[in-house]
UniProtKB/Swiss-Prot annotation:
GO cellular component annotations of the record: cytoplasm
One function term, GO molecular function aspect: protein-lysine N-methyltransferase activity
EC numbers: 2.1.1.-
Protein name: Ribosomal protein L11 methyltransferase
UniProt cross-references to Pfam families, sorted A to Z: PrmA
Underlying gene: prmA
Species per Swiss-Prot/TrEMBL record: Alkaliphilus metalliredigens (strain QYMF)
């Protein structure tokens, strides 16, 4: 079967928005190459041990997001829709850089596995290592290994937002904790929480592919007795409360979620919110405060932030 590879040159800031546009346009799988990932690796000598040397020869400015569309009658319409949607992003405050959209015809076998050669075992926390299921890795003492095959779902663990969320979970989650993972993607944060000792984790996503991939990764990591995967949104599929809620999505959705998240947190419950570009931090903080949440701290990595907040004054349980 023939596929059309759609490549979009953009910025690290716009990566998630561009990826979402591709998914909305009907792509089957997304890959992301981001120069910020290399900058982060340069800050950690240890991480270089896990990078394919072929990557170091690749010249990349900004970010390159690729998606794949089947060659079909409505292809031209979908491509035009993608181009128009990318062009509109600056109106929402995003710097898209070149915003250049190009296409290339490829065979299915060319794209469905080629991205795997760039996905290597990576430290995403003090003791957390994400390892692709097809890679060999010798575990060091004290390390927690997360086996991942993200498939078509967003979330390999190497993005700044995922790393920051994982690092905060590593500091916070303990035995008997209940954790909700909102917009679970590939399930990586749910698995991290489970392996950190959480008693119960509920992973929620609106996307059917994300639900399937999360369940597969949960099973592969032997945490299906802890992690329950639910299809839908938080308000519709969850009725209980959590000690920690983590949401690695985008700023606008965090703002919407802030209105309801207090109804799902236990007394002194913690809300870990990421997927937030630096320009949106103050707006998100203001909304969290307006909805009875107290800002604990803000951490940044590259052009992204994670905001940690907690419920003011507790709740009646």
């Amino acid at each position: 079967m023939k596929w059309i590879e759609v490549s979009i040159k953009t910025t690290s800031e716009a990566v998630e928005a561009v990826a979402n546009i591709l998914y909305d346009g009907g792509v089957a799988g997304v890959s992301i190459e981001d120069e910020n990932d290399f900058s982060l690796l340069e800050q950690s000598n240890e991480a270089w041990d896990y990078v394919d040397e072929a990557l170091l020869d690749r010249e990349l400015e900004g970010a390159l997001v690729k998606g794949y569309l089947p060659e079909a009658a409505d292809l031209a319409y979908k491509l035009e829709l993608i181009r128009q949607s990318v062009a509109l992003l600056p109106k929402y405050g995003l710097n898209i850089g070149l915003g250049e959209v190009t296409t290339l015809e490829v065979n299915e076998e060319d794209w469905s596995h080629s991205w795997k050669k760039y996905y290597k075992p990576t430290h995403i926390g003090k003791n957390i290592v994400v390892k692709p299921t097809w890679e060999e890795y010798e575990r060091k003492e004290g390390e927690m290994i997360i086996e991942m095959d993200p498939g078509m779902a967003f979330g390999t663990g190497t993005h700044e937002t995922t790393m920051m969320c994982a690092q905060e979970l590593e500091k916070i989650v303990g035995a008997k904790y209940t954790v909700f993972d909102i917009g679970c993607g590939s399930g990586i944060l749910s698995i991290v929480a489970a392996k950190l000792g959480a008693e119960k984790v509920i992973a929620v996503d609106l996307d059917g592919t994300a639900i399937r991939v999360t369940q597969e990764n949960v099973d592969a990591n032997d945490v299906s007795d802890i992690v329950e995967v639910r299809h839908g949104n938080l308000m519709d599929v969850v009725t209980s409360r959590a000690d920690v809620i983590v949401a690695n999505i985008i700023a606008d959705i965090i703002i919407l979620l802030s209105k309801d998240v207090k109804n799902f947190l236990k007394k002194e419950g913690i809300f870990i919110a990421s997927g937030i570009i630096l320009d949106k931090v103050e707006v998100v903080k203001a909304q969290l405060i307006a909805n009875n949440l107290e800002i604990v701290k803000v951490e940044t990595m590259g052009e992204w932030a994670v905001i940690i907040s907690k419920l003011k004054g507790g709740v009646d349980e």
